[in-house]
Amino acid sequence: MNIAVIGLSHKTAPVEVREKLSLPETEIQNAISELCSGTYTQEVGILSTCNRLEIYVVTNEMQPGIREVTQFLSESSKIPLNQLRPHLFMLLHEDSIMHLMRVASGLDSLVLGEGQILAQVKQTHKLGQKYKGIGRILNRLFKQAVTAGKRVRTETSIGTGAVSVSSAAVELAQMKLEDLSNYQVAIVGAGKMSKLLVQHLLAKGANKISIINRSVGRAQDLANSFKDANIKVYSMLEMVQVIGESDLVFTSTAATELILDKAKLETILDPLKPLMLVDISVPRNIGNDVSELPNVRCFNVDDLKAVVAQNRESRRQMAMEAEVLLEEEVEAFDVWWKSLETVPTINSLRQKIETIREQELEKALSRLGSEFAEKHQEVIEALTRGIVNKILHDPMVQLRAQQDIEARRHAMETLQLLFNLESEMSSGKVI
């Protein structure tokens, strides 16, 4: 079996490409089902965020397995493979393992050290299990990656004062507008990113904030979490009017289609009044053509790179601390991965010993008589099972823990010879 990751991110593809490959949670089940129906793909985990789509697979044949994934990506995005391929990255086994560890730790994020990605990796693991895409190998890998992410955030300084896409968006606005307290601000959307936007806007001095959302109740809940801020709430039906009265607008919704374009705005905007739009959604919420309107400036997530660059250098040294921890977690996974080679031998030995135990127990109970056997069978059963487990425990632990490949294989061959396991394994009795 081989592990691989195929995908694209803010490092390899512009937002125009990434948005075509953004998979909302509602589509993950079908995507996993389609990929798992392939001939060469045994396990699948799909990580989809605003800055990346990564498909982790366990495949029995590497090249055909990768081909199945790239074909799926091309068909899903409706981008011909020859045009999509330059934006894709592919990492195999050790490289794919380290990559997921770095992703979970925030070291591969647009905003170095951001914390939201760890929750997104956890959700990928959860959905992969729910929809039967993640099996034994990816289950262990994602658990190890989550452990790595937690360790990096608690044992290093990378998480201290870490910024997010939302905070970078507010920073960009402040760079362009300076004193945010002078501006009327609107936020379209009421999710986690919007909550962070409000938090950072208030910290920067903004005091005239409106939230626009499809569910007014959800927008009100968000406003209520900042009780002293006097935040106004509007429905999507009022969106265009509110934007027309605003100086700065952020969009952060899960909409898969554009919610703002030139046609919607040109009739309500004052051509003499400047308007700054910051779209942190993927797929994008705002069409490119709004920039054709007089006095309108529009930015998207790719425009945050300049802001992030200022923060990145000071955090690069912190990231080096984290890499040491990640090496430890990769090694821990690798030890487990290599131990899988011992599973057939261990299962075969356990099956053989269990068969002997059951046979000898049956003989003993028949000699003791039915009355005694019925009364004490459970105790004797537990006793014999306990003895077997105790005897097998240390040899099995030592066999799994043996990291030297030659030594481990020699130990397996010795066990197979001493217990005549070859015939057991070849006869299909292994469980």
Curated annotation (Swiss-Prot):
Q: Does the keyword NADP apply?
A: yes
Q: What is its EC number?
A: 1.2.1.70
Q: Which residues bind substrate?
A: 49-52, 109, 114-116, 120
Its pathway, per UniProt, is: Porphyrin-containing compound metabolism; protoporphyrin-IX biosynthesis; 5-aminolevulinate from L-glutamyl-tRNA(Glu): step 1/2; Porphyrin-containing compound metabolism; chlorophyll biosynthesis
* Entry-linked InterPro entries: 4pyrrol_synth_GluRdtase, 4pyrrol_synth_GluRdtase_dimer, 4pyrrol_synth_GluRdtase_N, GluRdtase_CS, GluRdtase_dimer_dom_sf, GluRdtase_N_sf, NAD(P)-bd_dom_sf, Shikm_DH/Glu-tRNA_Rdtase
Task: Write out the entry's keywords from A to Z.
Answer: Chlorophyll biosynthesis, NADP, Oxidoreductase, Porphyrin biosynthesis
Q: Which residues form a coiled coil?
A: none
Residues of the active site are 50
Q: Which domain of life is it from?
A: Bacteria
Which Pfam family, any one of them, does this sequence belong to? GlutR_dimer
Which positions bind NADP(+)? Answer: 189-194
GO function term, MF aspect, one: glutamyl-tRNA reductase activity
Q: GO annotations under biological process?
A: chlorophyll biosynthetic process; protoporphyrinogen IX biosynthetic process
Task: Decide whether keyword RNA-binding is in the record.
Answer: no
Where is the site labelled Important for activity?
A: 99
Q: Which reaction does it catalyse?
A: (S)-4-amino-5-oxopentanoate + tRNA(Glu) + NADP(+) = L-glutamyl-tRNA(Glu) + NADPH + H(+)
**Subunit composition and interactions:** Homodimer.
Q: Which family does it belong to?
A: Belongs to the glutamyl-tRNA reductase family.
* Recorded domain comment: Possesses an unusual extended V-shaped dimeric structure with each monomer consisting of three distinct domains arranged along a curved 'spinal' alpha-helix. The N-terminal catalytic domain specifically recognizes the glutamate moiety of the substrate. The second domain is the NADPH-binding domain, and the third C-terminal domain is responsible for dimerization.
User: Which NCBIfam families would you find in this protein's record?
Assistant: hemA, PRK00045.1-3
The misc remark on file is:
During catalysis, the active site Cys acts as a nucleophile attacking the alpha-carbonyl group of tRNA-bound glutamate with the formation of a thioester intermediate between enzyme and glutamate, and the concomitant release of tRNA(Glu). The thioester intermediate is finally reduced by direct hydride transfer from NADPH, to form the product GSA.
Q: What function is annotated for this protein?
A: Catalyzes the NADPH-dependent reduction of glutamyl-tRNA(Glu) to glutamate 1-semialdehyde (GSA).
Which PANTHER family does the record associate with it? GLUTAMYL-TRNA REDUCTASE 1, CHLOROPLASTIC
Name of the protein in its database record: Glutamyl-tRNA reductase
